Amino acid sequence: MIHYHCADISGDKFLELAGHHLLVSHAYPRRVSDAHDIAATMLLDNGAYTAWTVGKEVDWNDYYTWVEPWIGKYPTTWCVIPDIVDGGEEIQDKLISQWPHNNRGSPVWHLDEPIPRLLSLIDGGWPRVCLGSAGEYAEVASNGWMARMNSVFNKVDKTFGQMPWLHGLRMQGIACGRSSGNFPFGSVDSADVARNNNRKQNTITKMVTAWDKQQPRVPWRQRPEQRELADFTTTL
């Protein structure tokens, strides 16, 4: 599993990220050129989560223009196709249909959307599909979130027989077994290093190395699922 680390770090400490897999968000784009100079591979994020947290709309045409030179020059750079957190299926499908850069992007499936939509995206020829937390599953690692993720991976495993490349947006900690999660993503991302490297006990090199060593258990083994409340009410 690849760990993408947010590259929004100031000063010379940024260079300690050299040789690792890095992420630059459209919401914080200042390091995009520098990161391409030192990264093993690059992920360009659309900034949808940041926009959602502050109630801001994103100019997607600006995003298309921003990613174009990087995915054009660097074969190891990919990006997240625009999405709107809590936007609903119709809006998400429209944004995917408007994407101008073919399979250099990956679509987002939100946990509050129907699982068949995820299966359709996986089967649609995209190199990977991103999973994002939203709606009643907005809080990563909550009990409801964990139950939903177990259902998702159970269904994906049963449907395809082998695990496709799924990318966990903001799911690095839960994917690696620091809790009861341990989900076999192809890749995950996190801003942990960018946010917490200034703590006394931390260095960038130490943090990145520790994260990159953590890998989920494979293969996926079917897990017990919690029945939804609606399932009980329909049987009464």
Feature names for model-found ranges:
Residues V58, E113-G124, L166, M171-S187:
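Catalytic cores of alpha/beta
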Residues T41, I96-N103, N143-C176:
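Alpha-helix-loop-beta-strand connector modules within alpha/beta enzyme cores
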Residues D45, P107, S180-F183:
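Conserved, mostly hydrophobic/aromatic
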Residues P107-A141:
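Histidine/lysine/aspartate-rich catalytic loop segments that bind and position anionic ligands
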